[in-house]
Amino acid sequence: MDLSFIEGFETIWTVVRAVVLNYLLRSLKILSTILYVSAVISWNVSLKVFGNVLLPGFLTIRTVVIFILRIVSLFLWILADPAILLVQSVYWYFIRAPARFILMVGITLYPLYVLLSWAVFLGIIVGFSLNSVFTFIDSFATPSSNSTVTEAMTKMKNEKVLEYPYKDRNIMLGDLASRIPSKDSEKLDEERQPIALEKTKSLDSISHSSSSSRKSSTELKIPPVETRIVAEIPVPSSVKRRRHRPNKSMGSIKNS
């Protein structure tokens, strides 16, 4: 019984499965056709709507937005133009121009600096070499040059010591007797004293006379107090005019 039941169930299941599959295939075909038709219809409708409604609206909105943005940008440009010019001027005159100037100065001065450094270096080398060569030649030409120089220096020192005014400090004790003044020198000093006194008196008299002459000249220049007081008194204008009248009359008489 079990096998017959299983076989009957399998036959029934195969029939039911075939029916269900056929139904599903038909439903899928129907749904696919419906979806295709709906898609075509929606596409056509959307094209019509977009072409007649959305596209013109989008274009108008785009033009309006661009116009507003241009107006705002122009307004901002007008406001920011002085600042932009200021920034450009600062850049060109305070950054770019000094940088270019420094660059040009560096380009022009660096070769000169290199040449000058080489010239100094070569000058040092040449001078050192020439000095060494000439010292070598002098050592062969005048081997006793150092001794002659030392002798000349000692002679100069001795001459200076002899000419030094305070040379009595270096005198030996044996020479002190020769430095004591004698009676003849004392007599000569006594004879010379009155002559010196007469000269000093004559000089004093000359200086006294010159000072007195200077005093007299200064006294003559300075008027006494009374005359200064009289001179400082103001003179009226009428008196001044009267003083000039006789001069005019005398001038007229002379001319006549």
Swiss-Prot record:
Membrane association type: Multi-pass membrane protein
Primary residence: endoplasmic reticulum
Residues the record lists as Phosphoserine modifications: 210-211
Location of region: Disordered: 198-256
Gene Ontology CC annotation, any one: nuclear envelope
Subcellular location: Endoplasmic reticulum membrane; Nucleus membrane
Domain of life: Eukaryota
UniProt keyword Endoplasmic reticulum, yes or no: yes
Keywords recorded for this protein, A-Z: Endoplasmic reticulum, Membrane, Nucleus, Phosphoprotein, Transmembrane, Transmembrane helix
Residue stretches spanning the membrane: 5-25, 30-50, 64-84, 105-125
Sequence ranges of Low complexity compositional bias: 203-215
Name of the featured protein: Uncharacterized membrane protein C1919.04
